[in-house]
Amino acid sequence: MFVIGVDPGAAGAIAILEAGGKLVHVFDMPSVEVISGGKAKRRVSPEMLAAELRLYADQGAVAYVEQVGAMPGQGVSSMFAFGQAFGIVLGVMAGLAIPTQTVTPAKWKKDMKLNGGKDAARAKAAQVWPAHAGEFKRVKDDGKAEAGLIALWGVGVT
C-alpha cells in the first residue's frame, strides 16, 4: 500500500511513501503553462497528474491533501486558481478511486511537531529521508518537503 501526500497548487508537490514511511517518489505538481489575461500562468494538469498516480492507485493507495484556506493579501483570481487546483487534485483522486482525506496545515504540522516555516519543513524532510535530502535542498523545494511530511503524517493515521 502507498500513502500519497499532496501540497496542492500549481507550485505544490506530490510525495509517495510506502506504508512504513519509506519515500518512494517525490515530484513537483504536474502543470502546464496557459495564457490568462495576456500573462503566462502555471495550472495543474489533471491528465499529467492522473498519469503519475495511476500506477500507485492500481496497487492500492490512500491520499492526504492539505486543505488551505484564504491567505491574507492574496487576490481573488489567485484564490480562484488555488481552489481550482485543489479541486483538480480531489477530482483526479476520485477518478482513480484513491480514498482521500484533507488535513489542515495546523493539524498536520502540530502532530508532526513542525515549528517554523518552509525552511523548517525542508530541514525536517531532509532529516527524515537523508538519502533523499537533495530533493529538499532548494528554497523552492518546500512543496516537496511539505508533501512528504503530509504523507508521513498520513502513515501515522492510516
Residue ranges and their predicted role:
Residues 1-158:
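Phosphate- and other anionic-substrate recognition elements at nucleic-acid/protein interfaces
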